[in-house]
Structure formats: C-alpha cells, structure tokens
Amino acid sequence: IVGTGGDGYKTLNISTATSLVVASHGVKVAKHGNRSVSSLSGSSDVLTELGININIAPELCEECLNETNICFLFAPLFHGSFKHVAKVRAEIKTRTIFNILGPMCNPGNVKNHLIGAYDKLLLHPMIEVLKSLGSEQAWLVHSNDGLDEISISDKTFVHKLSNGQVLEEILEIDKIDVEPSKISEIVGGDARYNAKELFKVLEGEKNPYREITAINSAAALTMCGFCDSIEDGLLLSKESLDNGGALQTLKNLINVSNKLA
C-alpha cells in the first residue's frame, strides 16, 4: 500500500494510515517506504514521529510482520542504490524515476498491491510491470483531481490486475458512502503535525482525513479479496477506526519494532 508521491498536494500520509487499518483486520501488510523528498513528511518520517523504529534489521522484519500483521521496510536498508541517491533527491526536491520504481520494488516479494500514481499515464505501464513481475492482485489508482490515491473530492481512475487480466474502471465518489471534501481539507504538514492527525484518525475522530483513509482502506481490503466490495470494505474500515482496532495495531507496531531494535 503505497503512493508514488510527487502529486504536489502534500496530503496527510494516507497510505500509512491505510496500512494500519488494513493490518488491523489480520491482513499482512509489508509497507515499503522512504523519507520525504518532495513533500513535508514521508512515511518513514511520520512513523518515526509516532515512535516506531523504522531501522529494523531486514532479517527481523518478518518477525515484526508475524507479530503485528504489519512491518515497515525502510528502502535504504534494502536497496543500496536508493541510499546513494537519497542526498541528491532531497536537494532537488522533485519527483524522479525513483518515485515510480520504489512502489514496484517492495523487497517483501508481495503479490498484492494498492499503488497510487501521480499521473494517469503511469497506470497502464506500472500495472503491466507488476503483472510481469508475478503480482496476483493489484490496483493502480490516480484521481481526476490529481492525487496519487483514491480521492474524496473527484472520481478516481483504477487499473485492476486479477487472474492475469487487467481491467480499467472509474470509481465515482458520489456513488460511495463517504463524505466528500475538498483537497485543501486533507492537506498535511510536517511529520509532527501528520503524526498527531493520523493518531486522531486512529482514535476514531471523524473528519476528512478519516474519510479518505477509510475509502483507501476499503479499496485495499477489496483488492486483496478480504471483502467483496468497496461498500463492505468501508464498513470494515470504519469499524476498526471506531472500535480501536487500528489504534491497537499502531501500538503493537510501536512495541514490537522497538523490541526488535
């Protein structure tokens, strides 16, 4: 569950929140990510702010995954080339080919993917690459308003891989049970701000951050076959936000990741 980044909107870390919600249902999530390049807070930045140890030795990540249903695979620990270009990427502060490569280079050898792309033109080539790499189920998404995730303010273009076949669909937000909001209402801030707001979502606070987390979580749960429809996925996602399941998953990840330090 990851986005390419580079959409220019600097939203909250939606894929990170989504990963925690999905994992709370027992679905194993190997979250692959890096530090911020063009945004104010990358997935590793906000996870660090939340108290999670992102520098788990690669050989211990599987143990974390088995104990908590989620692990964070910090890209520089697995891909030496990413480490060498990190400084340059941080200096130029714009999207590069690594925004596209990163989401497709998950070292966990995962077979199911929900990936957001910053450009609609990337959906077809990226999902074809995933297909050639042996992925079983995958959704590539890009919203009409430019987000690298499913939007709650406009329709979203979806390329779906299943059973070796790729289908193209459009997800119409007005046909789904979510509260629409403007992009300006899901913009994030620095790592501290994002961590605070993400925690509020996991505590059950009802706001636009919750809505976009819920719809993306619903998509992930549907993509991997845990539920049959986006509507069912929404019910499950909101349930784990309301009953504390997603928050407990975060707490478990904090405890286990630091235990494995």
What are these regions (language model features)?
Residues D7, T11, G26, T48-N55, ...:
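Glycine-rich anion-binding loops and their surrounding alpha/beta cores
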Residues I1-G33:
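Active-site cofactor/substrate anionic-group-binding motifs, chiefly glycine-
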Residues H32-R35, A57-L65:
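Short, surface-exposed recognition loops or helix-turn segments adjacent to catalytic cores
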